């Protein structure tokens, strides 16, 4: 377990595996179980994935937030992949042959809802953990893409809002290539034609569609899908920078999930400067 860097000189950002610190890993699992209302958070992937985790040194080393990650090439098993995403999506031959070896999967993320500094949550992980990770893997393993899933939980969003969010991202970034959902919740036609009123007549221009969606959700007193928007904003809403795949339903977490693939070279200069910091401890990722 190695320190990557610090966030605001208060949160310590580490990269670790289960075997590095079983005690801390146990605390992480308790936080995840509490955040997602699970009896047990540990799963079959925890022995192979790494965790980037933020620790509050001023609060008795309280776990604040974290992200799970792995290089797809390290999870390849013949024609299969031991990846969380692979549970929900089948990989096309194009993805397996031309993308997988250059792709970093970001697994589940979490924030300790009881932590004193939870407001820094995933931002601290992105700025001081994932940014350095992406820099390192780009330089040392020729990584070009980020693969993951973004969730919309039923206890946070009503179904109408979920469909509106999925439609907006599908209209702007949707593709049926590369990843094929094993059990899709919607067809492309269903996503494209869903409409509740004229406010949801998305044009495919991300910036204007983002305004429409945000206004629609605000009127319904529903939260903005921050993580969804963050990935799109990283590439300034460019279609060449982000691909979204047909949604699936996660019955364990009771949420709809949409897979995505982000092209690292399309991250905007402003966001590169903000997140992809070059000052960090590279030994944390060796």
Residue positions per predicted region:
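C-terminal/domain-terminus segments
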Residues: 125-126, 130, 228-229, 235-277
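Catalytic micro-motifs at enzyme active sites that drive phosphoryl/nucleotidyl and oxygen chemistry
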Residues: 40-44, 51, 90-97, 247-249
């Amino acid at each position: 377990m190695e320190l990557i860097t610090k966030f605001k000189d208060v949160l310590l950002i580490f990269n670790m595996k289960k075997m590095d610190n079983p005690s801390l890993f146990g605390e992480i699992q308790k936080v995840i179980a509490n955040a997602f209302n699970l009896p047990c958070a540990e799963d079959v992937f925890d022995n192979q994935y790494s965790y980037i985790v933020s620790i509050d040194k001023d609060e008795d080393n309280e776990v604040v937030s974290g992200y799970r990650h792995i290089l797809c090439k390290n999870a390849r098993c013949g024609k299969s992949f031991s990846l969380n995403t692979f549970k929900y999506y089948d990989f096309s031959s194009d993805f397996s042959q031309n993308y997988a070896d250059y792709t970093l999967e970001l697994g589940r993320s979490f924030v300790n809802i009881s932590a004193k500094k939870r407001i820094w949550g995933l931002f601290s992980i992105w700025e001081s953990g994932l940014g350095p990770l992406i820099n390192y893997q780009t330089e040392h393993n020729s990584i070009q893409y980020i693969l993951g899933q973004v969730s919309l939980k039923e206890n946070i969003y009503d179904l109408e809002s979920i469909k509106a969010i999925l439609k907006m991202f599908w209209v702007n970034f949707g593709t049926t290539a590369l990843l094929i959902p094993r059990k899709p919740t919607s067809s492309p036609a269903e996503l494209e034609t869903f409409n509740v009123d004229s406010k949801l007549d998305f044009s495919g221009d991300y910036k204007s569609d983002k305004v429409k969606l945000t206004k629609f959700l605000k009127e319904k007193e529903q939260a903005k899908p921050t993580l969804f928007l963050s990935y799109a904003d990283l590439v300034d809403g460019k279609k060449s920078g982000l691909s979204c795949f047909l949604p699936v339903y996660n019955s364990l977490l009771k949420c709809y999930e949409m897979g995505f693939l982000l092209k690292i070279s399309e991250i905007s200069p402003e966001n590169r400067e903000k997140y992809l910091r070059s000052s960090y401890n590279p030994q944390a990722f060796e």
